[in-house]
Amino acid sequence: MDVIVRKGEIRGKAKPPASKSYTHRAFIAASLSPSARVVNPLISEDTISTLNACKRIGAAVLKKGNEWLFSGVDGVEAEGYFNFANSGTTLRIFTGLLSLSPFRSVVDGDESLRKRPNGELVLALSKLGARFKGREPYTPPFSVQGVIKGGEVEIEAPSSQFVSSLLFALSLAEGDSSLRVEKVKSQPYIDVTLDVLRESGVKVEREGNFYHIPGSQSFKLRRYDVPADFSSASYLIAAGLIAGEVVLEGMFESAQGDRKIVDICREMGGSVEWDKKRGVIRAERSELEGVEVDASDIPDLVPTIAVLAAVAKGKTRIYNAEHLRIKEIDRIEGIHQNLKALGVESKPLKDGLIIKGGKGEFRGVVDSFGDHRMALAFSLLGLLGEVKCRNAEVVSVSFPGYFRVLESLGASVIRL
């Protein structure tokens, strides 16, 4: 599906979807607990991949309104073929969990996931006793077979998902573990994992980049209410800043690193108010200026920041974002190509971009390149002109109903 977004003012209230990061982890923790309910999860293509994987390892799942009821497994003894579609989080965490099973499994995904390397995670799990067969750097498909045992292990973590995988798996492994993490990116996503583990009664002690994980623990999640997603909220905040006024509800504090979007927008001169007690964020049209942004912990915000940078006066430099080159696509190159298509000057760097903004109108054709965050972000620039986004259906990966939400705020959206 292609989408055209046309110039117009937006105004109104909206509630962003539930957090994708929290939903993944809550589903997995629930599937490892005797009896748990996950309330108000995000149901999207990626989280459905996790839900299906939870069922494949033996969890029973029942939907009841906006609650998902789980009867979980006592230990992982799964085998067979696992297709995780486009979900990197599902792939990485379940690679760790399947390392607990004495039986052989094959993990796979779609064309995009088959390009995402897992070498550092495979190396760490292999040192703990897992066996893998595949081609380095272990892009899917590859096979995994346990059983890992606790021990001392270290990992270079270009993806925080590798660390999350080890934290889940080692808490169930026989024997205590010490995990040393080097060159970590996106620490807040690890904090989200620790938050869910803590709610599940799983103990992890952290000291700097060292984690001590007692072995043979039991998951005891009872109920988890999934908070709103700040990554998804970032697009609506950006819409308010460039084209009117948006009030977002249900935006309470959490461990999500992407809550930093509020501070970044303010640094750019944006009028953004956040009432944390009421969980309300208000964003109004503002004159924006370029800034420098360290994206090491906020990779999913970079497309949003790039769109705001295109509007802002002056230059914006985004750095420490080299991990964007191994996301669903090479996001640095994808952002550069879409900015170029809209007449915005940008320079891709090894670890980010420099964007020269200040345009008041945007007309042209952009492409999602199969990446949901590209479609979510770049379609917004149509509010200041007319932008056609190719392959926009991928928004369903993290924000189903996105264009309906824009329409409810007054945007003109044409589906082709």
Curated annotation (Swiss-Prot):
Q: Which Pfam families match?
A: EPSP_synthase (PF00275)
Q: Could you state one GO biological process linked to this protein?
A: aromatic amino acid family biosynthetic process
Keyword Lyase attributed: no
Enzymatic class:
transferase
Q: Which GO terms describe its cellular component?
A: cytoplasm
Q: What GO annotations for molecular function exist for this entry? A: 3-phosphoshikimate 1-carboxyvinyltransferase activity
Instruction: Name the catalytic site residues.
Output: 300
UniProt-annotated binding residues for phosphoenolpyruvate:
20, 88, 116, 161, 331, 373
Q: Which UniProt keywords apply?
A: Amino-acid biosynthesis, Aromatic amino acid biosynthesis, Cytoplasm, Transferase
Cellular compartments annotated? Cytoplasm
| Functional pathway | Metabolic intermediate biosynthesis; chorismate biosynthesis
Q: According to the UniProt entry, what is the EC number of this protein?
A: 2.5.1.19
| Keyword hit for Transferase | yes
List ligand-binding residues for 3-phosphoshikimate: 20-21, 25, 159-161, 186, 300, 327
CDD domains referenced in this protein's UniProt entry, alphabetically: EPSP_synthase
Q: Which reaction does it catalyse?
A: 3-phosphoshikimate + phosphoenolpyruvate = 5-O-(1-carboxyvinyl)-3-phosphoshikimate + phosphate
Whom does it interact with, and what assembly results?
A: Monomer.
Q: Which family does it belong to?
A: Belongs to the EPSP synthase family.
NCBIfam families reported for this sequence: aroA
Explain the purpose of this protein. Answer: Catalyzes the transfer of the enolpyruvyl moiety of phosphoenolpyruvate (PEP) to the 5-hydroxyl of shikimate-3-phosphate (S3P) to produce enolpyruvyl shikimate-3-phosphate and inorganic phosphate.
- UniProt name for this protein: 3-phosphoshikimate 1-carboxyvinyltransferase
The scientific name of the source species is Archaeoglobus fulgidus (strain ATCC 49558 / DSM 4304 / JCM 9628 / NBRC 100126 / VC-16)
